[in-house]
Amino acid sequence: MKPSPASTPVGSTLRISLVCNTAWAIYTYRQGLIRTLVARGVEVTVIAPRDRTFDLLAQMGCRCIDLPVASKGTNPRDDLRTLWALYRHYRAIRPHVVFHYTIKPNIYGSISAKLAGVASVAVTTGLGYVFIQSSRTAQIAKKLYRFAFRFPREIWFLNRDDMAAFTEQHLLVHPERARLLHGEGVDLEQFAPTPLPESNQVTFILIGRLLWDKGVGEYVDAARQLRARYRDVRFQLLGPVGVDNPSAISRDEVAAWEREGIIEYGGEAHDVRPFIAAADCVVLPSYREGVPRTLMEAAAMGRPIVATDVPGCREVVTDGINGLLCEAKSATSLAEKLAQMLDMSGAARREMGERGRQKVAAEFDERAVVERYTDLIRNLTGVSL
């Protein structure tokens, strides 16, 4: 079904809102979109829990509004607070289009937008615990998805597996509104190829929020196994710790791994490029993903990858071509693939990285993704950007 354009008076400023459970994710994954919208005169509002990226988003030209979201919680009162807060913001801002990301904004934001008479788009950035677990909470979340997803004008999925999961489990009342975005893209100029480090020591790095669901525990266990067999190898972690997520890893747990001498923790970084450039291989043993930005960035910079054979990761990695795929939730399988990478020659790793750059350039160019956004905005508002 093609939605009818929203009313946008000639000469008025186009207002677009981006809503997520972390401002960090908006800043990290959607800079290209924000720059394009701001440069074309759009009033961009980011609605998310306040964090240190609010200032950075403001510097880019965004208006930022704090949002109460209990990502870890299942208290209905907290969720109603989120729904009511979004409804009030939408009534006050009157955005022409709202894009929702992550579970709670997708569910409660879609409902709030409908109540406020605002056009919305749901972007499923990865299904997370809803499809990893079979708990009562996960079953309730699926029912909420089915109810809320009758309201967005379009529902975007980042990979075919997630789209198929929603379709097969009958969570889409209007399946004709589903679209495949195929990842959120990467800036190919910003993440340019760099040569592999010239060192006899091989460095692995896992970049992302430190969550058990990202396979951090398996990564640490695999590192522990391999350190007993290989001398010249380093295992690094980079990303926020103790985040508001049911699967969060604490700083104390990371500190214990550091004391044991298994891993090196680099903290957080706004710019991950120096860390990717200093690594020989990027690792992501996640249980499930949308299409992981980390892997797109790594491939764009010419790094071979070791990842799990799960939705999202296998969108970026073709086993044996630009990286290696291992079993999910298996430190043994991960250790085997990391050992295989260690036993390769530097030339073989370089060739894998070069093929990864070619794949990302062909399939994940951020410019094509931004064009999908601007095309939809035009269809919904009648305004060409």
Regions found by a protein language model. Give the residues of each.
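Acidic anion/phosphate-binding donor-loop and adjacent secondary structure
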Residues: K2-P3, T74-D78, T167-E168, H182-Q201, ...
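A short, well-ordered alpha-helix in the C-terminal region of glycosyltransferases
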Residues: A347-E363, V369-D375
